Amino acid sequence: MQRQTTRIISNKNIAAGIFDLTVEWRSAEIALPGQFVNIYLKNPAKLLPRPISICDFDGKQLRMIYRSTGAGSGTDELSGYGEGDEIDITAPVGRGYPIEEIKGQAVGGDIVLMGGGIGIPPMYYLAKKL
């Protein structure tokens, strides 16, 4: 885990208040399903980073889907950033899911993943790795 400055590749509004953010990955570290990214905003009044779950990772790009929580919020500020903007992130954060353990507990090879709301995006990356 390290703090780094990265470039936004895209930050698209995909549904009411929901955004799909993709950033460059400039580290040799591998992001695992279940880990997250701390995003530091440019506004010095917002000191705490915004933790956003990783939705996908291909070794060169990190993809996150997040909800803007309303006017004046940190995620509202983040939703205004666009392609080419630079942001500071700390990533990957957290332990991630125990993929091999999950595979070992599969009954008949089937695994059911459950999530709700903004908890669904991290399931996408987990499903790809299972």
Indicate where each model-derived feature is located.
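FNR/FR-type flavoprotein reductase catalytic core
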Residues: S73-L130
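Ferredoxin-reductase
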Residues: Q2-E83
